[in-house]
C-alpha cells in the first residue's frame, strides 16, 4: 500500500472531433502498439458507418450501446476459512464504463466481418439494439451475481 494514498485520476480530455470523453476512451481501448492514428481511423470509420446505418448522431448510438453493456453487479473472489466464495458486489460507475468498453472492443475483435471498422461498427449497433456478444457478457455477469446472492453478506 502506498503511504501517500491512491494516485490522483488524470482528467480525460474531450475528443477533438466528436467532443466526447467516451470517444477518447474508445480510441485508447482500440490502441495497439502505440499506433494511435490507426486507432482513431478505426473509431472514426466505425462511427461514420454507424451514422450511415442509423441516421442519428453516432455518439448517441455509442452511449446507448454502452448503457446496454455496462454491468451493475459483478462477482469478486473472497477467501473465507479455506473456501473461496464468489461474492457479488456493485460496480463503480467508472469501472462499469471501462468494462463495457473492454467487452465492446474485445468482442468486436472476435467478429467475422472483414475489416475492424465493420466489426466495431456492427458490435456498437448490435449493443445499442440490445443484441450482440457484449450484451450477452453483461447478462452472464448479472446471472453469476444473482446465483451467488447467498454470499452477499461477505462483502467488504
From Swiss-Prot:
Domain of life: Bacteria
Function: One of the primary rRNA binding proteins, it binds directly to 16S rRNA where it nucleates assembly of the head domain of the 30S subunit. Is located at the subunit interface close to the decoding center, probably blocks exit of the E-site tRNA.
Quaternary structure and partners: Part of the 30S ribosomal subunit. Contacts proteins S9 and S11.
Keyword Ribosomal protein: yes
Protein family per UniProt: Belongs to the universal ribosomal protein uS7 family.
Record-linked Pfam families: Ribosomal_S7
Gene it is expressed from: rpsG
Name of the protein in question: Small ribosomal subunit protein uS7
GO molecular function: rRNA binding; structural constituent of ribosome; tRNA binding
Organism: Mycobacterium leprae (strain TN)
